[in-house]
Amino acid sequence: MNSIIELTDYYSSNNYAPLKLVISKGKGVKVWDTDGKQYIDCISGFSVANQGHCHPTIVKAMTEQASKLSIISRVLYSDNLGKWEEKICHLAKKDKVLSLNSGTEAVEAAIKIARKWGSEVKGITDGQVEIIAMNNNFHGRTLGSLSLSNHDAYKAGFHPLLQGTTTVDFGDIEQLTQAISPNTAAIILEPIQGEGGVNIPPKGYIQAVRQLCDKHQILMIADEIQVGLGRTGKWFAMEWEQVVPDIYILGKALGGGLYPVSAVLANNDVMRVLTPGTHGSTFGGNPLAIAISTAALDVLKDEQLVERSERLGSFLLKALLQLKHPSIKEIRGRGLFIGIELNTDAAPFVDQLIQRGILCKDTHRTIIRLSPPLVIDKEEIHQIVAAFQDVFKN
């Protein structure tokens, strides 16, 4: 294991600081390191593996398509793209979908759509369009996505970033109201902040944002890359407040843990600003990606993983809330997306959990984030809870 870590560290760029663990196999909820030790994966590639690692249905779809046709580019039609587009548009109740690859790429596309809509439809002078984002957000690390962030450490050394972006506190509707100007074209938010620490907004906040957008002719963009597709116990986390955004951004679990697939969805009145040549993606919507994503969506539906997430997530949250320890500040979550916030450094607790076979990661130094595959069962949840009890007891 050490030789693998040394080799990787020697040749890899320095933008990651991985846990000193080498994983070589995954199946369902579990992963194994190179020494053969088994772990319950509570990271899931940050909600990529909602369907579990190497789900046989998705693997089968991948291998069958890979042996037939993998790439043709969007200059031609493929035989499976239209059916997938119909499926995902019906799921999101939107007219159109733009198929892409990574999550941050989809955010970039949504920014372009919002800017173009702002100038062409709302009538804002081109170059003066503004977008409001939330403090503590995470939309990605490419320049456009990064421009939405308020984290100076993420942005240091990468200026100049996009102009016309501002951030306000997540959950503060008064502050958001004050930030709106005639040039505001869009408000982008995560319905539940993931990287920020599983931050759930006050009840009614998402509805209030929707009302503001309707009042001021502003696009509401929901970044559901991490929290969508069953993670919080709903197909879309926006459903917790019965709100439909103007634009959905999806990714991560859309590729079933096997392939990078992302999407931007909107109705015709928004998506029509994209015309031939205004946007494109070499690999976006390729036949292999679409076969995998189709199977990934089918697995979520056929195995009722969204409902399972809500049911078992509630069970896990209730059990974790029984934990008593002076280090625990708050435990919060929706579905199988849970944050344990401590009033001290979380890293030592994470180390102890990993030693007990629970693979997890801290975020923002004091928060342990849990997002196991949605195929997890009650016995595995009992193991997670037992590990937490043991760690906090000792």
Curated annotation (Swiss-Prot):
GO CC, sorted alphabetically, is: cytoplasm
**Primary gene name:** rocD1
Tell me one GO molecular function of this protein.
identical protein binding
Q: Where in the cell is it found?
A: Cytoplasm
**Family named by the database record:** Belongs to the class-III pyridoxal-phosphate-dependent aminotransferase family. OAT subfamily.
What is a biological process (GO) this protein takes part in? Answer: L-proline biosynthetic process
Q: Recorded E.C. number(s)?
A: 2.6.1.13
User: What pathway or pathways are given for this protein in its record?
Assistant: Amino-acid biosynthesis; L-proline biosynthesis; L-glutamate 5-semialdehyde from L-ornithine: step 1/1
Q: Which reaction does it catalyse?
A: a 2-oxocarboxylate + L-ornithine = L-glutamate 5-semialdehyde + an L-alpha-amino acid
- Say which enzyme class the record assigns: transferase
Q: Which organism is it from?
A: Staphylococcus aureus (strain Mu50 / ATCC 700699)
Query: Which cofactors, by name?
Result: pyridoxal 5'-phosphate
Assigned keywords, A-Z: Amino-acid biosynthesis, Aminotransferase, Cytoplasm, Proline biosynthesis, Pyridoxal phosphate, Transferase
Query: What is the protein's name according to its record?
Result: Ornithine aminotransferase 1
Q: Which domain of life is it from?
A: Bacteria
Biological function: Catalyzes the interconversion of ornithine to glutamate semialdehyde.
